Amino acid sequence: GGVHGMERIGSQILLAWLENLLARCQWDEGLLHLLSKVRLVCIPLLNVGGLLKSTRSNPNGVDLMRNAPVEAQGFTAWPLGGQRLSPKLPWYRGQKNQLEIESQVLVRYVQEKLLGQPFSLAMDCHSGFGLRDRIWFPYASHRQAPPHLAEAVALREVFNNTYPNHSFYLMEPQSLNYSTHG
């Protein structure tokens, strides 16, 4: 959460969820059993500087969502997909081949904690696109179906069946809307 400093809801959701988990650990033996079998990794706030400045980007003017070692394949909507012209324009990716410190820490953390595990599920919680709330599947760097699409669709069906009145959420691959660097 907190990749975009001004989008505070993602951090708040993660913190509320963690508070709920901790409170349930007092009495929920099923949850305790589950937590003894899995590793839970959470970063509620990545962009501390952006939060303090109330900006989307970090203090260097870099949009951390676009500052990653991933280049989009094919067409990206400029500047939405990321641009390198100026940190004064939105969606600035930073200098080529230079990750911001926040991005370096995140990449290293994912490599150490998630990669190499038999199964991992990553979720990015942030707000802000269009007039409809969305829950997007990852891999927006290309238009091909993301890996494990069947599993993502199955999770969507579980969510739909568990929360049948949530019709305000649109769940789909992000790349159906636009491709992006990062």
Regions picked out by a protein language model, each given a short descriptive name:
Residues 1-182:
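Structured catalytic-domain cores with a bias toward divalent-metal coordination
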